[in-house]
């Protein structure tokens, strides 16, 4: 999860987030090289005597500054499109969970079970136990099996919301009347925190999301106790 004064991304917990982190580093390196080149040219202009001030045509230079940006954009677009299609793929999910956004809480329904559904509200600061996180803890966590593909169906009962868990590389809009889907796959067990990421009213800041990723055996025991 995030911590104060953090400069980088959260630790990747899913294959998609690992891909997004690598793409971020790839793009940032390209930006760094371009920025270095531009600063070098500016420093030359400021520290050396200008020459060729009367040049009216430079076909070679124009060719370079047309082709080079196109190549750079292709180097950015290709891995971006690859990740985009990976995020849309859902192959044989073992579980489907329907998520509904409300003002201002989330409700969850495990569609593979008959009566496994609940609402998830933020725990007020006054009710927190020692060690719990302010504005991030909920009364009912979403318990899911780790290392297995899970399909999340996301919508809203009222206004626009956005269901986001940064460490899993997830951010999907919850739109009234529309059903969006996302894939959740966690590489390790643990608690993973997120929040509503679309301004949805006065209590927008009080819609946390907590995923508890556990081994399959523990998930089966939990689901049996909830039914």
Curated annotation (Swiss-Prot):
CDD domains: CcO_II_C. Mg(2+) binds at residue 198. It is a multi-pass membrane protein. GO terms for biological process: ATP synthesis coupled electron transport. Keywords: Copper, Electron transport, Magnesium, Membrane, Metal-binding, Mitochondrion, Mitochondrion inner membrane, Phosphoprotein, Respiratory chain, Translocase, Transmembrane, Transmembrane helix, Transport. Residues 1-14, 88-227 are mitochondrial intermembrane. One of its GO terms (molecular function) is cytochrome-c oxidase activity. The chain crosses the membrane at residues 15-45, 60-87. It holds the Pfam family COX2. Cu cation A1 binds at residues 161, 196, 200, 207. It catalyses: 4 Fe(II)-[cytochrome c] + O2 + 8 H(+)(in) = 4 Fe(III)-[cytochrome c] + 2 H2O + 4 H(+)(out). GO terms for cellular component: mitochondrial inner membrane; respiratory chain complex IV. Residues 46-59 are mitochondrial matrix. It is an enzyme of class 7 (translocase). Binds a dinuclear copper A center per subunit. It is found in: Mitochondrion inner membrane. Cu cation A2 binds at residues 196, 198, 200, 204. The modification Phosphotyrosine is found at residue 218. InterPro entries: CcO_II, CcO_II-like_C, CcO_II_C, Copper_CuA, Cupredoxin, Cyt_c_oxidase_su2, Cyt_c_oxidase_su2_TM_dom, Cyt_c_oxidase_su2_TM_sf. Its EC number is 7.1.1.9. PANTHER family: CYTOCHROME C OXIDASE SUBUNIT 2 (PTHR22888:SF9), CYTOCHROME C OXIDASE, SUBUNIT II (PTHR22888). Component of the cytochrome c oxidase (complex IV, CIV), a multisubunit enzyme composed of 14 subunits. The complex is composed of a catalytic core of 3 subunits MT-CO1, MT-CO2 and MT-CO3, encoded in the mitochondrial DNA, and 11 supernumerary subunits COX4I, COX5A, COX5B, COX6A, COX6B, COX6C, COX7A, COX7B, COX7C, COX8 and NDUFA4, which are encoded in the nuclear genome. Component of the cytochrome c oxidase, the last enzyme in the mitochondrial electron transport chain which drives oxidative phosphorylation. The respiratory chain contains 3 multisubunit complexes succinate dehydrogenase (complex II, CII), ubiquinol-cytochrome c oxidoreductase (cytochrome b-c1 complex, complex III, CIII) and cytochrome c oxidase (complex IV, CIV), that cooperate to transfer electrons derived from NADH and succinate to molecular oxygen, creating an electrochemical gradient over the inner membrane that drives transmembrane transport and the ATP synthase. Belongs to the cytochrome c oxidase subunit 2 family. This is Cytochrome c oxidase subunit 2. It comes from Leopoldamys sabanus (Long-tailed giant rat).
């Amino acid at each position: 999860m995030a911590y104060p004064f953090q400069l980088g991304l959260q630790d990747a917990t899913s294959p998609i987030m690992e891909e997004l982190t690598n793409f971020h580093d790839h793009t940032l390196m390209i930006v760094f090289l371009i920025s270095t080149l531009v600063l070098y040219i500016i420093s030359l202009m400021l520290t050396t005597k200008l020459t060729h001030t009367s040049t009216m045509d430079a076909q070679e230079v124009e060719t370079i500054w047309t082709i080079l940006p196109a190549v750079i954009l292709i180097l950015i677009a290709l891995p971006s499109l690859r990740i985009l299609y990976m995020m849309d793929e859902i192959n044989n999910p073992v579980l489907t969970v329907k998520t509904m956004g409300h003002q201002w809480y989330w409700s969850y329904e495990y569609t593979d079970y008959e009566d496994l559904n609940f609402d998830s509200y933020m725990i007020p600061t006054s009710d927190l136990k020692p060690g719990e996180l302010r504005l991030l803890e909920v009364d009912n966590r979403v318990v899911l099996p780790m290392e297995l593909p899970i399909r999340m169906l996301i919508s809203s009962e009222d206004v626009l919301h956005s269901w986001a868990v940064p460490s899993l590389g997830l951010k999907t809009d919850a739109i009234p009347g529309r059903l969006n889907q996302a894939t959740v796959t966690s590489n390790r067990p643990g608690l993973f925190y997120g929040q509503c990421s679309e301004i949805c009213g006065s209590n927008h800041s009080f819609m946390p999301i907590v995923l508890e990723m556990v081994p399959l055996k523990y998930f089966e025991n939990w689901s049996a106790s909830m039914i």
